[in-house]
Amino acid sequence: MRITWLGHAAFEVEIDGVNVLIDPFLSGNPKAAKSPDEVDPDLVLVTHGHGDHLGDAVEICKRTGATLVGIYEIAVYAQGQGVENVEEMNIGGTIEVEGLEITQVPAWHSSEIVEDGEIVAGGTPVGYVVSGEEGSVYHAGDTGLSMDMKLIGELYEPEVALLPIGSRFTMGPKEAAKAVELIEPEVAIPMHYGTFPPIEQDPEEFKREVEELGLDVEVVILEPGESYER
């Protein structure tokens, strides 16, 4: 399993020969490691409707034929935008696609799609657990800290957790460290920080918070474009 951070909350997860692209905010992302034309996913997972997460998902799926996975409202929206292959689901559900198990889990945030200054339905924000033969990864999406994370850890046992640390709109370093304690992954990778001034954070602070809790978890700090492999 190879996990590449593309900046912000965007990741490429290569698992069991399947390329999974999550929250592809690439256009307009000053830290993006790739452009929309440089990705060729099999699946595109969208956690919620905000522009820095839905991002280029529709355009990428239309260009590549990738399947877009999203909560029901986002899947229907994508279909209306011309995406041919969608998998709609909802929190608590698991689907099997491309040989992988994909589970939608709760995220505490908001979700709207804005078009021409008008808000259209974006459904409920979610996270994902992606599981295959080579391992499992939990992408938390944008979220605050919640006890749901303990259940996510107990039920799905993700080996790698991708967690926002930017604060203001999501957890900060302290809350994200507590999330690590609840989830009990083997590896934690911080995300959703440093893209814009309101979410500037030092990822080393997150690492220190995890260490202060005495957790036997490896914190891997990536630069955009760097990968973690296991």
UniProtKB/Swiss-Prot annotation:
Alphabetical list of PANTHER family matching this protein: UPF0173 METAL-DEPENDENT HYDROLASE MJ1163 (PTHR43546:SF3), UPF0173 METAL-DEPENDENT HYDROLASE MJ1163-RELATED (PTHR43546)
GO molecular function terms noted in the UniProt entry: hydrolase activity
Q: Where is the signal peptide?
A: none
Q: Which InterPro entries match?
A: Metallo-B-lactamas, RibonucZ/Hydroxyglut_hydro, UPF0173, UPF0173_UPF0282_UlaG_hydrolase
Belongs to which family? Answer: Belongs to the UPF0173 family.
Q: Which Pfam families match?
A: Lactamase_B_3 (PF13483)
- Please state what the protein is called: UPF0173 metal-dependent hydrolase MK1542
Keywords from the named record: Hydrolase
